[in-house]
């Protein structure tokens, strides 16, 4: 038995809510995956605050119909698609998918959308290679701390150099 119109409308409403919350989306060809493998993918993505939805392309097309930023995604709505909607950290979601793909070797990354721009699978992989937000913050903090340390050492060195110069001059006059 097929889905009723009310059921489809509920799915579209749910997808609209997820799209509104999402910062990014990417599309995966899930053909050949078992239910257990899709569940595994969903569990891995949950840690990065992402949702994996397997739905008809027509329902996703209707969910993004009113959102202009999401229109480029319609180019990817062909075939058997799973939609990964990322709420917070795109890098960690892509890394979670790449780890899953490495383990199963059954899926294909078709492309994605970030800030209204369609991304190829290579561009998505490049985003996955970037360090996480926490690592970037730590690197910036370390760089700032390093500059402050060098500045403090430099300021401290001025009186020390002056003292050594005075001592050298006094030793020359004594000799």
UniProtKB/Swiss-Prot annotation:
* Entries under InterPro entries matching the protein: Ribosomal_uL10, Ribosomal_uL10-like_sf, Ribosomal_uL10_bac, Ribosomal_uL10_bac_type, Ribosomal_uL10_CS_bac
Q: Which UniProt keywords apply?
A: Ribonucleoprotein, Ribosomal protein, RNA-binding, rRNA-binding
Q: Which GO terms of the molecular function aspect are on file?
A: large ribosomal subunit rRNA binding; structural constituent of ribosome
Give the highest taxon in the source lineage. Answer: Bacteria
Q: Name one GO cellular component term.
A: large ribosomal subunit
Asked if the Swiss-Prot or TrEMBL record annotates the protein with the keyword DNA damage, the reply is no
Q: Where are the transmembrane segments?
A: none
* Gene Ontology biological process terms, A to Z: translation
The record's subunit annotation is: Part of the ribosomal stalk of the 50S ribosomal subunit. The N-terminus interacts with L11 and the large rRNA to form the base of the stalk. The C-terminus forms an elongated spine to which L12 dimers bind in a sequential fashion forming a multimeric L10(L12)X complex.
Q: Which PANTHER family match?
A: 39S RIBOSOMAL PROTEIN L10, MITOCHONDRIAL
Q: What does this protein do?
A: Forms part of the ribosomal stalk, playing a central role in the interaction of the ribosome with GTP-bound translation factors.
Q: Which family does it belong to?
A: Belongs to the universal ribosomal protein uL10 family.
Name of the protein described by the UniProt record: Large ribosomal subunit protein uL10
Q: Which organism is it from?
A: Synechococcus elongatus (strain ATCC 33912 / PCC 7942 / FACHB-805)
Query: Which gene carries the instructions for this protein?
Result: rplJ
């Amino acid at each position: 038995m097929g889905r009723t119109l009310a059921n489809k409308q509920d799915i579209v409403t749910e997808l609209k809510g997820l799209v509104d919350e999402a910062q990014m989306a990417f599309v995966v060809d899930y053909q050949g995956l078992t239910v257990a493998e899709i569940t595994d993918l969903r569990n891995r993505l949950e840690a990065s605050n992402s949702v994996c939805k397997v739905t008809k392309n027509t329902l996703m097309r209707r969910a993004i119909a009113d959102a202009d930023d999401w229109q480029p995604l319609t180019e990817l709505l062909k075939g058997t698609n799973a939609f990964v909607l990322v709420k917070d950290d795109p890098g960690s979601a892509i890394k979670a998918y790449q780890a899953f793909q490495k383990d199963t070797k059954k899926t294909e990354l078709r492309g994605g959308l970030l800030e209204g721009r369609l991304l190829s699978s290579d561009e998505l992989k490049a985003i996955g290679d970037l360090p996480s937000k926490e690592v970037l913050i730590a690197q910036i903090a370390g760089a700032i701390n390093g500059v402050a340390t060098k500045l403090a050492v430099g300021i401290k060195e001025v009186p020390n150099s002056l003292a050594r110069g005075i001592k050298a001059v006094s030793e020359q006059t004594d000799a």
